[in-house]
Amino acid sequence: MVWHGFLAKAVPTVVTGAVGVAAYEALRKMVVKAPLRAATVSVAAWGIRLAREAERKAGESAEQARLMFADVLAEASERAGEEVPPLAVAGSDDGHDH
């Protein structure tokens, strides 16, 4: 009876281990066959894509934070009784009088 309980618990563990070893060996053989340069280029391309996406999201977040801060500052100035000048975008002076 004790052996039956032991085997009932051990068999799934052994099967899981065997499947893991088989998957590891298959992956190892596939990596050995694949050219290292192609794999390196693929990983670098993924890294570039991720960096661009992170940069885009950071830019959007920075713009959102700037606008939120400007709104808070304008409301605070308004409550304090000061007139709030419109925000100017840096580098927007094109030399024309409108």
UniProtKB/Swiss-Prot annotation:
Entries under InterPro entries matching the protein: DUF1490 (IPR009963)
Segments for region (Disordered): 77-98
A matching Pfam family: DUF1490
Source species, domain of life: Bacteria
GO CC entries: peptidoglycan-based cell wall; plasma membrane
Induction comment from the UniProt entry of this chain: Highly up-regulated during the early stages of invasion of the human blood-brain barrier.
Family: To M.tuberculosis Rv1991c and Rv3269.
Protein name: Uncharacterized protein Rv0968
Organism: Mycobacterium tuberculosis (strain ATCC 25618 / H37Rv)
Lineage, highest ranks first: Bacteria, Bacillati, Actinomycetota, Actinomycetes, Mycobacteriales
